[in-house]
Amino acid sequence: MGSQETNLAPHVLIFPLPIQGHVNSMLRLAELLCLAELDITFIVSEFSHSRLIKHTNVASRFARYPGFQFQPISDGLPDDHPRAGERVMDILPSTKNVTGPLFKQMMVENKCFSSATRRPITCIIADGVLSFAGDFAQEKGIPLIYFRTVSACSFWACFCMPELIESGDIPIKGNGMDLIVKSVPGMETFLRRRDLPGFCRVNDINEPKLQILKTETRQTTRAQAAILNTFEDLEGPILSQIRKHMPRLFTIGPSHSHLTSRLETKNIKTLISSGSFWEEDRSCVDWLDAQPPRSVLYVSFGSITVVTRDQLLEFWYGLVNSGQRFLWVMRPDSIMGKDGQSQIPADLEEGTKARGYMVGWAPQEEVLNHPAIGGFLTHSGWNSTLESIVAGVPMICWPYFADQMINSRFVSEIWKIGLDMKDTCDRETIVKMVRELMEIRKDEFLQRADHMAKLAKEAVSEGGSSYSNLDGLVDYIKSLII
């Protein structure tokens, strides 16, 4: 190694699965590492990159970090592919079969992105479901760190999949959904079959989705280290189980508030770090400004969930009939097929005008922190769950698929900061749950949510567990320089 290279910063390659929630989490990690003066090459799909440039401040946000660079790559899907609903799973075989070979070629041709001012890749931080990135790292002798963008509880349940199959809990065929699952250590008293990750709801253990999940999760242990976007006070008992298999585990979350904390520590102006693939309609913030404190239920099912027209109408009637104010995010592509083009009943339109507001996409972090928000009807995606926890906002959980099923169980049964409405979509239940959250048990839920928000803030403040773990991660990466 030349003396010039000796003085160069560590160079980290970060590679997320190209869907919004994963890209968002790993962009925040990238910025946290930039603040520690590490060089970052961020692999991003061409589709994701174009959406980020069009709809967010990502260009100006990272312009202040000269050591950061995007490296676009194809995700193998046509631009008009929906990348939502069940079809979002198409991204896994596509990235493996198309992106994988392109990535390998890119790394070889670019000499691991080294230059006169940038050392070759020090380590690869890959999304935990991109095993081909791990294969390349092992082949080239590059240290590998996996970032799992899901909750610790979801990762651990997936890790225990061989035991779940052996015990007969998987595949879930529709019967016995409320039976307690005994083969996930640490969850033996409260985890039901219906709470297992959505990919477990298959008729055959050879189902490709199930096999991908099983394979990708178990291979995580080959990495030298792993990162989770969570914090010790939230998932400590489950983290203890994971550390038996992966002792070098860095919990650095909630990453969005951790980033804010670090920027404030360095007296850097905080830019709202949206990673949205859709244009945000900020008119909803003006509407919230005119509402009483803690009076509005925020409704958003994330970047992937799609609903049928029947489900849409049940939610809509439930919200209107509850008598509560609501702000509802309805993505343009969130209604299945042509269902969304049908006529909306007049009574729903009138009820919405009186107490509701609807937008195609919202600045969620800002909305959840608005004083008018009193509850969050959510799909229980992990980023949304953490954002709600940080904001001290109780939740009604209507999980759609994947890790969301188990997240919603923890929200209701373990953390007790909300209600679980999974596998139900009728207006009477929605009315009942909305009133329970926003009226009947409002003070109880707000008190618990406020306590959890304080724990989250402590974790990312100087001396907190996540703050210390990020410092430890940076030190570990620096130690990898040969």
Curated annotation (Swiss-Prot):
GO terms for molecular function: 7-deoxyloganetic acid glucosyltransferase activity; quercetin 3-O-glucosyltransferase activity; quercetin 7-O-glucosyltransferase activity; UDP-glucosyltransferase activity. Pfam families: UDPGT. An anthocyanidin binds at residues 22, 402. UDP-alpha-D-glucose binds at residues 149, 362, 364, 379, 382-384, 387, 403-404. Its EC number is 2.4.1.323. Keywords: Glycosyltransferase, Transferase. The keyword Transcription does not apply. Iridoid glucosyltransferase acting exclusively on 7-deoxyloganetic acid. No activity with 7-deoxyloganetin. Catalyzes the fourth to last step in secologanin biosynthesis. Belongs to the UDP-glycosyltransferase family. It catalyses: 7-deoxyloganetate + UDP-alpha-D-glucose = 7-deoxyloganate + UDP + H(+). One of its GO terms (biological process) is (-)-secologanin biosynthetic process. The active site is at 22 (proton acceptor), 127 (charge relay). Expressed in leaves, roots and stems. Lower levels of expression in flowers. Preferentially expressed in internal phloem parenchyma cells. This is 7-deoxyloganetic acid glucosyltransferase.
